[in-house]
Curated annotation (Swiss-Prot):
Gene3D superfamilies: SH2 domain, SOCS box. It comes from Homo sapiens. Residues 82-163 form the SH2 domain. This is Cytokine-inducible SH2-containing protein. PANTHER family: CYTOKINE-INDUCIBLE SH2-CONTAINING PROTEIN (PTHR10155:SF9), PHOSPHATIDYLINOSITOL 3-KINASE REGULATORY SUBUNIT (PTHR10155).
Length: 258
């Protein structure tokens, strides 16, 4: 649709009086008087009157995507051998009490708002850190100030492997001041439920150091799985290996080094 506006012209006598005789013929305006507006002018007016949409629109949640992400994480954890299932914080403390610093395991969280908890032996004893899940990603629980700096991962095994590699690189670094490991708050699950257990120090943060997983005896890893771990540590892309399809599929089922 083309919009037209009437240009300036002198008023006729009948128009000055505001009356028009019935016998008066219809007036034909000269061509220059009727000037079409450019097509973009109307669009610009509409654009100016329409409020701009905010850039940070809420993300639409996809339950199917969440289900697939959580199912994949459970599959990886069962293959790992260091997923301990539904043990409590006290049981995890007993298992890790005599282990060297940096020994860790993953278990189900006792908090209804979390799926998993990372239990690790630190300089202050066994410590539990909850693992958050949001927007199809997992991250370590932390306070509000440091949360934007905490990395997110598509599954729990990728999360743990990242921090193990980070701690290993810091240990091997020749620099006098290696990059610090993430400082995380003491969650409520660390409060000892047994009065006989010693209470943790009143510090508010603990430096996380992950070195080696604590494999469950009932989930002893097979020789095939151990060979798969070695291949994953030595080869960046298993698709480049001249392997039978069945063996290549087995390697892809657990593409991790832990």
């Amino acid at each position: 649709m083309v919009l037209c506006v009437q240009g300036p012209r002198p008023l006729l006598a009948v128009e000055r009086t505001g009356q028009r005789p019935l016998w008066a013929p219809s007036l034909e305006l000269p061509k220059p008087v009727m000037q079409p507006l450019p097509a973009g002018a109307f669009l610009e007016e509409v654009a100016e009157g329409t409020p701009a949409q905010t850039e940070s629109e809420p993300k639409v949640l996809d339950p199917e995507e969440d289900l697939l992400c959580i199912a994949k994480t459970f599959s990886y954890l069962r293959e790992s051998g260091w997923y301990w299932g539904s043990i409590t914080a006290s049981e995890a403390r007993q298992h890790l009490q005599k282990m060297p610093e940096g020994t860790f395991l993953v278990r189900d969280s006792t908090h209804p708002s979390y799926l998993f908890t990372l239990s690790v032996k630190t300089t202050r004893g066994p410590t539990n850190v909850r693992i958050e899940y949001a927007d199809s990603s997992f991250r370590l629980d932390s306070n509000c100030l440091s949360r934007p700096r905490i990395l997110a991962f598509p599954d729990v095994v990728s999360l743990v492997q990242h921090y193990v590699a980070s701690c290993t690189a810091d240990t091997r670094s020749d620099s006098p001041d290696p990059a610090p490991t993430p400082a995380l708050p003491m969650p409520k699950e660390d409060a000892p439920s047994d009065p006989a257990l010693p209470a943790p120090p009143p510090a508010t943060a603990v430096h996380l150091k992950l070195v080696q997983p604590f494999v469950r005896r009932s989930s002893a890893r097979s020789l095939q799985h151990l060979c798969r771990l070695v291949i994953n540590r030595l080869v960046a892309d298993v698709d480049c290996l001249p392997l039978p399809r069945r063996m290549a599929d087995y390697l892809r089922q657990y593409p991790f080094q832990l």
